[in-house]
Amino acid sequence: GGEMFDLCREYQMDTSHLQVKEGKTSVYRMALKDGVDRVHLENIPGVMEYYEPTRKDIEFTKTFDYIHTDLTGRVLHLLPEFKEAGCKVIFDFSINKDEENMAAVLPYVHCAFFSCEKKTPEIREFLIKARSYGPEYVVATFGEEGSMCYDGERFCEQGIRVVPVVNTVGAGDSFIAGFTWGLMVGRDIEGCLKEGADLSAQIVQRFNPY
């Protein structure tokens, strides 16, 4: 936790609302398949188990145009408030495609990301259904098979950049960061997908991606 705190400050991020608690750091236990491919084994919530943002934290968060979170961020109950404040919520569902979660979360989301093992014939139907709950964009990533975005009118696909892979930790997070950056600067869908693929390609070449 302390290392991440220092890293945030190194990148000149505002840490005034970062809560520091005694206890274990929230982590995912992971394994590497074939020496390079990350596999999530278990979420250990640590201090995040009891995390609750203060009212000052919430008001501070609402000053931003974009908010990124996920199912473990413990702010799902705040999504309606964030949307009402005009914030665009970027939501990482990871591998979770539970319909109950989608119905509860997606009405308040601007762009949703889903991690899929393979690009199956059913994926387009899934993205159409996910978008029917309300988000502007829904994106699926397929590892080495690239990515796909649906905006309600068309499906756009993007391949990966072929680079030497050290490990895939951070590949998904960096793809989301690149795609979101594209949204922020006004890229079209193709441009956003390319931004995601380019940043992800940089990250998978590093052993210490963060």
What does each of the following model-derived ranges do?
Residues 61-63, 76-89:
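Glycosyltransferases and closely related glycan-assembly transferases
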Residues 124-210:
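Conserved phosphate-binding/catalytic region of the ribokinase-like
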Residues 71-73:
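N-terminal glycine-rich "phosphate-gripper" loop used for MgATP/nucleotide binding
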Residues 83-157:
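Conserved phosphate/ATP/ADP-binding segment of small-molecule kinases
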Residues 1-65:
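Conserved N-terminal subdomain of the carbohydrate kinase-like
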Residues 43-50, 66-69, 88-93, 116-118:
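Short, flexible loop segments at the rims of nucleotide/cofactor-binding pockets, characterized by
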